[in-house]
UniProtKB/Swiss-Prot annotation:
Species this chain originates from: Arabidopsis thaliana (Mouse-ear cress)
Role of this protein: Membrane-localized H(+)-dependent K(+) and Na(+) transporter.
Domain of life, per lineage: Eukaryota
Consequence of gene loss (knockout): No visible phenotype.
UniProt-recorded Gene Ontology molecular function terms: antiporter activity
Subcellular location field: Membrane
The family this protein is said to belong to: Belongs to the Ca(2+):cation antiporter (CaCA) (TC 2.A.19) family. Cation/calcium exchanger (CCX) subfamily.
Xref: PANTHER family: MITOCHONDRIAL SODIUM_CALCIUM EXCHANGER PROTEIN, NA+/CA2+ K+ INDEPENDENT EXCHANGER
Record's protein name: Cation/calcium exchanger 4
Membrane-topology annotation of the record: Multi-pass membrane protein
Record key words, sorted: Antiport, Ion transport, Membrane, Potassium, Potassium transport, Sodium, Sodium transport, Transmembrane, Transmembrane helix, Transport
One Gene Ontology cellular component: membrane
Stretches that traverse the bilayer: 17-37, 132-152, 179-199, 211-231, 241-263, 268-290, 414-434, 444-464, 475-495, 499-519, 553-573, 587-607, 619-639
Amino acid sequence: MRAVNFMYSSNNPKFRGIFNGLCAIILFIFFFDQSDIYRNPLLKNLSFVDSSGKFNRGFSQFTVPRRHLSEVDTNGSSGNSSLSGDSTVSCSGLHEHRGYADQCEFLKSNPICSPDGFFDYLKFFYCSCRDFKILGYILLGVWLVALFYLLGNTAADYFCCSLEKLSKLLRLPPTVAGVTLLPLGNGAPDVFASIAAFVGSDKGEVGLNSVLGGAVFVTCVVVGIVSLCVADKEVKIDKKCFIRDLSFFLFTLVALMVILMVGKVTVGIAIAFVSIYVFYASLVAANEILRKHSRRLKLDSITPLLPMQGSVFSSPSVEEDIPMYSPLMELDTGEGPPRLHDSLPQWMWATNVAIYSNHFAKANVHDEERPPWGWTEDGAEVESSLCSKITSLLETPLTVPRRLTIPLIEEDSWSKTYAVASVSLAPVLLSFLWSSQDDTSLQARIVAYFIGIAIGSTLGYLAFKNTEPDRPPQIYLIPWVLGGFIMSIVWFYMIANELVALLVTFGGIYGINPSILGLTVLAWGNSMGDLVSNIALSMNGGDGVQIALSGCYAGPMFNTLVGLGMSMFLGAWSKSPETYMIPEDNSLFYTLGFLIFGLIWSLVMLPRNEMRPNKVMGIGLITLYLIFVTFRLSSAMGFIPWAS
């Protein structure tokens, strides 16, 4: 796994520290610019705050109908410019700003045009950076990268840790964990970005284009590059697994196409859509359990004189459970054949998101740079320590808020101070988020804060009395793990909601339909982990190629079924008993068409070449993706009128 870790940014802590420091500075700039913090969406409905951010003595409720720039026609979008409320403001007039001196005055007079987000990015760009547009582009661009980093880092350092612990506590077989918790860990950024687009920002078309765009990218570009990398290695792919995965994926896309054609979804339809993955996961788990059980029965009839890993008595299915890079000649101290491992290898848990992890960074620096005797003659140890302290200081604004609210019980990163603080502040954060909902009275908010503080104080006291400074708790682990799991989801939602709001802002600045940005920028950003990890796995050869290609199809299928399925379920639940209307975007059918064509291309080319990936398959898939991106961008810019 060292080859994989080397490709990640873990071996470059100085760059990571500088990047995190720059992101922290931008964060402080946004906070400083947000002089009117009570106008952000999380607090915009406080009954004692008026539209200008000043306290209202009469405590009268102030509400304003929100409207996104992307709800109007911008280079191919299909919305109209009429508001459902009493206001008749057309936010599409931002660039012309007729009747106003500039865009800043337009936004100040029409606050409903600002996209939902903690920070008002449009006002920051057009007002604070009015005379320094280049600086505004740079700051927003770096912050976009930072949000992608935070989304992936939360998955790698918090969410996957909780999933791994949960799998061990529940004693899930590796086959079951491999089709349930593992895809959730690797696909968490896509899933929660989709949910945030549907529920948080009410921009369902961004979520749809992000998930489907990521699926096209992974199944075409990543599979294409993997095919090119292993074309000369004559690696053979399991035919049954390949056909099974692609058949389920094609059925999923057909079902999604039917839902999009109908244009509306109910809670029952959303549950049925998610249940496709439940059936798929059950089938995979049952098949693997039966296969390994039959292998065990065969092994029982053969008793080798010297059981060893990789011997002639070991079947391929048994070796699948032996960790990578384990010794070839390792004697078994027990009797009989080698026993199967009861958990997934640790490195698999953050395969697709480990590129964002800080844990790998700390481990690699410690393992590779520190000499065995613990000191150096040239004072490099002091320099490394100083660099580490500076890096940690720069990372503080991005890491401390999450550490203070996400409970972790990792051996390497255990801290009683953070543990007590996290269980104390997590309920307060949940109370804050709940009280920021629409149509919540002042009395309900006060009660919510009181309950959050009371629960947090109680949990903090219990954690302080029942934990030790030098090691994590050994009892009551499930509440700790579930707490980390839930709070990781909360942070996912917050970061993903901000990411979608920033993409909507870029759509308003450039006059581009935000769904195109979801199809490209958001999809590419969330798929970088798949690209790096799957290529690295395939370069190792052997089972790595099978794992990489399986992930290229199982991952997007999970994101489509669970990500979009849960998004539609939450959207339908919020509109219940009425049906949830899916945002109309005819371009989604073109995306589905290209995605289906790419799957059929792979389904035809691999069996024709005896299940060996070759250059023809890889070049064909990459060419198909380039045609797809060119077609979608051209149609968005109006060069292909019939496709707009």
